[in-house]
Curated annotation (Swiss-Prot):
It comes from Danio rerio (Zebrafish). One of its GO terms (molecular function) is nucleic acid binding. Residues 46-109 form the R3H domain. Pfam families: R3H. Keywords: Phosphoprotein. SMART domains: R3H. This is Sperm-associated antigen 7 homolog. Residues 1-45, 119-169, 185-230 are annotated as: Disordered. CDD domains: R3H_sperm-antigen.
Amino acid sequence: MADLLGSILSSMEKPPTVHDQESRRKAREQAARLKKLEEDERRKKAEFRKKMEKEVSEFIKDSTLQKKKYNPMGKIERSILHDVAEVAGLTSFSFGEDEESRYVMLFKKEFAPSDEELEAYRKGEEWDPQKAEERRRLKEKAALEEEAASHTQKRPASPNSNYRDKYSHLIGTSAAKDAAHTLQANRAYGCVPVANKRDTRSIEEAMNEIRAKKRQKKGDEEAAGSGSSV
């Protein structure tokens, strides 16, 4: 009986010691602090969102502004600002090399940044529209010059140039130029000067006329001889 009573008493929960009471008290205090921190965090986020909504609204109403740059802020704040901007119909980007320097820029939809402008911000550079326009003009000019040079290289050399370059060291530049002009103008005659062909035909005609006259003269003389002998 005594053994049974002793077993029952030993199985019963022992009253907490002073150490256990202190541990439970600290646990309750820690839970209360965590709850308070969470409530403070929610309150701060709500206040920050409300502040950003007001600033974004003012930015949209100001027709003189195209973009708005914020100071560096934490990841949570950047996330809230991006969300507010999206709801308001704005375009937003984060820039900065590290977490400490990252910031947010807002852009109105009608003034969305170009790829060149975004690249400048990513490099940590200031965007200058005038300098960018000058670089664009120079780039276009260089492209046009390169295209013109390419067409010039592909263009075949003219007969004038070939003839002039080939024979200028023998007959002189002026003579070569005149000869090239003559050949170009009279290509239908097999590149032989037209004057030579005209002269040749005139001589042949003249010789035929001379032969005909000689034959006629000889015939006249023979006729005259026959008449005198009779």
